[in-house]
């Protein structure tokens, strides 16, 4: 037997190298085979419910790192709730209707307008479901636990029926109406858009300054006067029916030198406009208040059949332009509102594809709206005073990335204005984890217009509306519920397969259809109405979930999207918000803080991370960032996270190895019998348990990450485990001191594994497989550790906090000695301490082998004053010299008792007593040489 064999060197087959890319799929198959998700739900039956309702990602393409961050975050929350006494099922979902899928089919050569609509919709459905299958595997590979075999998908008959019922309740309450208000119109999609489908980009436009000649000045202006107008959308002049001024804005009548014409502009803008128009020696003839100009009539710049009326509007400012705006009620919301109030014609001169129509005039007909500027300039002639290119923020279609226009077309609307205050009242009851989120959602609802819910597309849920022979729209409870039942049985494609009369209840009549003939609506619903109905299609309809949901968690862009549409439909139906809490996340940016895009080549695919690092590293990264704001990710950042993971793993490996001979049922030492340092570590770890449990409850992942890493690096590695080898390796295998420390090791190991499970489930299960005395098959079926309280807890913490200060001072003294070449390693040191009474009392209270805690071979507590050469602090001073004696071959301490023993071992007296007591046979035979 060799001397080293008398050491209790930790033994374990738990590998240092994780091998996550290959091991994770193996664990996941095992979980699936063992039906872990179902078993966890069965365990928690009857416990308080917690419903995190999954916002549905769009079923198109591979998942990106933003998807991964979102689903991992949800998984951490659901797992932690399941391990904290809650029944927390997770039903993943997908959003499957809408334009992107139509665009994919178009790129594949499918021509929608040349094939049977039902066949086309079948292709859309097949493609959407193929994407659901693909993304489902992507999410499962991240280790996300949920009811993957029974997700919700917005194209299923049961979901579509639930959506129709949401619409029906809104219709019954009078919230649905048809109007021709201007809406966001995407010529590139040939459809109306909702606010949530708009994004803003900078756009360079041609702006024109031109003049309208006064036709009837109403006794205020002469007919040789011109009112100066500014526009950034020249094509809309073809539909201009008025000029709007601000009632309280001052306007001036001016005549520039050498100009026969007189002009009206805002007084505040005269100087800048004179410079722009090249006017010199401008004479101000008169000043008017805007309201004095009301109802003056002007000529249209070129259309002699049109008169333009001067009207008043609150939206007019003097921030730019001329203080006077031309008004085309068919092409703008403000224009529409003031136009309707003044009985102006709502003219629309652009068709659904962005092409100028016949009513725009023969010179414009057939041109694309953006290309008409030269024609407009030609038609204006000498009425054009100036033109310039301006860059401004402009709305774009978020899918096609093309600019949109405002365009008045008949659409179906949800009248948010009718129940706006109810919605705002409900927002006040929701808990927002970001206060700015509440303000943002509140302001959006407060300021938003009515919701355009109709779309002129094919792939979506039909609006369940019929038309009588006289054109009356029919949407009554009887017909809508009948449609819902048809959809529930056959799916929404039946709407296109049957005639209108075959979609109505048997025997249905309507006074507007004396001949019994009906037509059906051909528009579909906005996809935000699809996902915005999920509270009914899923949360209400799935018995395992509770409504309202406890939590909605999505990206911050969903304040105008899913958070918004879900809130509107839920309040409209039931008067309550669909969620009790909202947690929002920022966007994932690259390592430089730039937005990720394929064109820049700076995207990171979750699959690439899984291949290089493993999903665990991506999961750990999610906890390492403040996801309430935008976050950065790169392979370099993930490499740093991987290093942190390695530190966590190897620390826990040390605990596994050094409890391999520990049976908790037989070897555990009661808390009251632990040494002071072991009690301190038990209490410190219990503080970590509380911090992490509280952070899980508040969804504060970064708090968990910081607390965990700090505990492992500072409390364990830099302190407790730093001197642990002197105990667990050297003391007798069954000695009290070793069992005391193993008791703490095992307690930390088991509980920290449970605490890690929501974040690192693969690693936690791997560790659990080495803990033979734990009863649960899988750690995921266990509970998070409870927070404990201990006698004299605060007193012990105070004592050891003071000792840590003392230890830091001692380490400075040892470092100085090392720099002066007095010692090499700290075990070569004889440390002399010159304490005052406070420190002396402290060291007595610590009641431990202080030399062992400081990892020095010899320690002396001196009486009297410290020598001048000592390193002094306020309460204590130190001197360091080389310890006397020889190095013990077993414990590596320098000890004056070290000597060669009769059994061929050069060891100290302490080690000799251990060896002689525990290895009598080897002592009798003598040890082999090294």
UniProtKB/Swiss-Prot annotation:
Compartments where found = Cytoplasm
Sorted alphabetically, the Gene Ontology cellular component annotations on this record are: cytosol
Described purpose of this protein according to its UniProt entry: Catalyzes the attachment of isoleucine to tRNA(Ile). As IleRS can inadvertently accommodate and process structurally similar amino acids such as valine, to avoid such errors it has two additional distinct tRNA(Ile)-dependent editing activities. One activity is designated as 'pretransfer' editing and involves the hydrolysis of activated Val-AMP. The other activity is designated 'posttransfer' editing and involves deacylation of mischarged Val-tRNA(Ile).
Q: Name one GO molecular function term.
A: ATP binding
Q: What is the lineage of its organism?
A: Bacteria, Bacillati, Bacillota, Bacilli, Lactobacillales
Q: Name the positions where Zn(2+) binds.
A: 888, 891, 908, 911
Q: Which cofactors are required for activity?
A: Zn(2+)
Q: What is this protein called?
A: Isoleucine--tRNA ligase
Summarize where ATP binds, as residue positions.
598
Gene behind the chain: ileS
What the record says about its domains? IleRS has two distinct active sites: one for aminoacylation and one for editing. The misactivated valine is translocated from the active site to the editing site, which sterically excludes the correctly activated isoleucine. The single editing site contains two valyl binding pockets, one specific for each substrate (Val-AMP or Val-tRNA(Ile)).
Q: Which GO terms of type biological process are on file?
A: isoleucyl-tRNA aminoacylation
Recorded catalytic reaction(s): these are:
tRNA(Ile) + L-isoleucine + ATP = L-isoleucyl-tRNA(Ile) + AMP + diphosphate
EC top class, in one word?
ligase
Report the residue ranges where the short sequence motif 'HIGH' region is annotated in this entry.
Answer: 57-67
Q: How does it assemble?
A: Monomer.
Q: Which family does it belong to?
A: Belongs to the class-I aminoacyl-tRNA synthetase family. IleS type 1 subfamily.
Q: Aminoacyl-tRNA synthetase as a keyword?
A: yes
**NCBIfam families given in the database record:** ileS
Under the heading SUPFAM superfamilies, the entry gives: Anticodon-binding domain of a subclass of class I aminoacyl-tRNA synthetases, Nucleotidylyl transferase, ValRS/IleRS/LeuRS editing domain
Q: Which Pfam families match?
A: Anticodon_1, tRNA-synt_1, zf-FPG_IleRS
The record's comment on cofactor binding reads: Binds 1 zinc ion per subunit.
Chain residues that bind L-isoleucyl-5'-AMP: 554
Q: Where is this motif: 'KMSKS' region?
A: 595-599
Ordered alphabetically, the record's keywords are: Aminoacyl-tRNA synthetase, ATP-binding, Cytoplasm, Ligase, Metal-binding, Nucleotide-binding, Protein biosynthesis, Zinc
């Amino acid at each position: 037997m060799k001397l080293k064999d008398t050491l209790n060197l930790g033994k374990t087959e738990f590998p240092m190298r994780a091998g996550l890319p290959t091991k994770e799929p193996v664990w996941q198959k095992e979980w699936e085979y063992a039906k872990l998700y179902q078993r966890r739900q069965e365990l928690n039956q009857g416990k308080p419910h917690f419903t995190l309702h999954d916002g549905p990602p769009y079923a198109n393409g591979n998942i990106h790192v933003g998807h991964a961050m979102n689903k991992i975050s949800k998984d951490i929350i659901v797992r932690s709730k399941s391990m904290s006494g809650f029944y927390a099922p997770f039903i993943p979902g997908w959003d499957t209707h809408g334009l992107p899928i139509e665009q994919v089919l178009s790129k594949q050569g499918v021509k929608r307008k040349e094939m049977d609509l039902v066949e086309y919709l079948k292709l859309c459905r097949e493609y959407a479901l193929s994407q659901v299958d693909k993304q489902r595997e992507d999410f499962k590979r991240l280790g996300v636990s949920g009811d993957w075999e029974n997700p919700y998908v917005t194209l299923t008959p049961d979901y579509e029926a639930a959506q129709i019922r949401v619409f029906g309740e809104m219709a019954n309450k009078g919230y649905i109406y048809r109007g021709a208000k201007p809406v966001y119109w995407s010529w590139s999609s040939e459809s109306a858009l909702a606010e949530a489908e708009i994004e803003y980009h900078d756009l360079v436009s041609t702006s024109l300054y031109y003049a309208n000649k006064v036709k009837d000045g109403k006794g205020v202006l002469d007919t040789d006067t011109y009112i100066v107008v500014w526009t950034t959308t020249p094509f809309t002049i073809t539909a201009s029916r008025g000029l709007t001024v601000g009632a309280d804005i001052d306007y001036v009548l001016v005549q520039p030198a050498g100009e026969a014409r007189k002009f009206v502009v805002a007084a505040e803008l005269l100087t800048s406009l004179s410079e722009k128009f090249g006017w010199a020696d401008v004479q101000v003839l008169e000043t008017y208040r805007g309201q004095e100009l009301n109802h003056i009539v002007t000529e249209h710049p070129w259309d002699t059949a049109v008169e333009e009326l001067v009207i008043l509007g609150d939206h007019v400012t003097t921030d730019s332009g001329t203080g006077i705006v031309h008004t085309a009620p068919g092409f703008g919301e403000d224009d529409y509102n003031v136009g309707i109030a003044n009985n102006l014609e709502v003219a629309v001169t652009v068709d659904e594809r962005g092409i100028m129509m016949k009513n725009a005039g023969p010179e414009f007909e057939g041109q694309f709206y953006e290309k008409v500027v030269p024609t407009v300039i030609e038609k204006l002639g000498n009425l054009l005073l100036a033109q310039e290119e301006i860059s401004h923020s402009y709305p774009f279609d978020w899918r096609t990335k093309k600019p949109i226009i405002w365009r008045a077309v008949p659409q179906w609307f949800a009248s948010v204005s009718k129940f706006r205050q109810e919605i705002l009242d409900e927002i006040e009851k929701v808990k927002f984890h970001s206060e700015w989120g509440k303000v943002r959602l509140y302001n959006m609802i407060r300021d938003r217009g009515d919701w355009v819910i109709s779309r002129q597309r094919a792939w979506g849920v039909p609006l369940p509306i019929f038309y009588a022979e006289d054109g009356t729209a029919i949407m009554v409870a009887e017909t809508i519920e009948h449609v819902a039942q048809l959809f529930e049985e056959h799916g929404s494609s039946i709407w296109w397969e049957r005639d209108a009369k075959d979609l109505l209840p048997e025997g249905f009549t309507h006074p507007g259809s004396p001949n019994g003939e009906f037509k059906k609506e051909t528009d579909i619903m906005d996809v935000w109405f699809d996902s915005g109905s999920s509270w009914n299609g899923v949360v209400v309809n799935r018995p395992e979930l509770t409504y309202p949901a406890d939590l909605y968690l999505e990206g911050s862009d969903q304040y105008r999207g899913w958070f918004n549409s879900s809130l509107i439909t839920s309040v409209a139906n039931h008067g309550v918000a669909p969620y009790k809490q909202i947690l929002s996340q920022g966007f994932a940016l690259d390592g430089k803080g730039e937005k990720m895009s394929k064109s820049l080549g700076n995207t990171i695919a979750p699959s690439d991370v899984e291949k290089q690092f493993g999903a665990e590293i991506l999961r750990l990264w999610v906890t390492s960032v403040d996801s309430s704001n935008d976050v950065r990710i790169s392979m370099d950042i993930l490499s740093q996270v991987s290093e942190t993971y390695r530190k966590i793993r190897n620390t826990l490996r040390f605990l596994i190895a050094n409890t391999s001979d520990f049976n908790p049922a037989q070897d555990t030492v009661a808390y009251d019998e632990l040494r002071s340092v072991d009690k301190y570590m038990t209490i410190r770890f219990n503080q970590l348990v509380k911090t992490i449990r509280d952070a899980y409850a508040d969804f504060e992942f970064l708090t968990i990450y910081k607390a965990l890493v700090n505990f492992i690096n500072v409390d364990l590695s830099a302190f407790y485990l730093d001197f642990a080898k002197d105990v667990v390796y050297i003391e007798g295998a069954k000695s009290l001191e070793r069992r005391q420390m193993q008791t703490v090791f095992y307690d930390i190991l088991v509980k920290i594994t449970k605490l890690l499970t929501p974040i690192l489930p693969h690693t936690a299960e791997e560790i659990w497989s080495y803990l033979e005395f734990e009863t649960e098959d899988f750690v995921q079926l266990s509970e998070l550790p409870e927070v404990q309280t201990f006698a004299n807890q605060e007193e012990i913490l105070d004592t050891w906090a003071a000792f840590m200060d003392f230890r830091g001072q001692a380490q400075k003294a040892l470092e100085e000695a090392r720099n002066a070449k007095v010692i090499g390693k700290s075990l070569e040191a004889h440390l002399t301490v010159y304490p005052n009474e406070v420190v002396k009392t402290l060291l007595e209270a610590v009641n431990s082998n202080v030399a062992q805690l400081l990892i020095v071979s010899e320690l002396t507590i001196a009486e009297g004053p410290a020598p001048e050469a000592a390193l002094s602090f306020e309460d204590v001073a130190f001197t360091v010299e080389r310890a006397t004696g020889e190095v013990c071959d077993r414990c590596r301490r320098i000890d004056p008792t070290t000597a060669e023993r009769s059994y061929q071992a050069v060891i100290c007296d302490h080690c000799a007593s251990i060896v002689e007591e525990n290895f009598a046979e080897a002592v009798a035979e003598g040890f082999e040489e090294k």
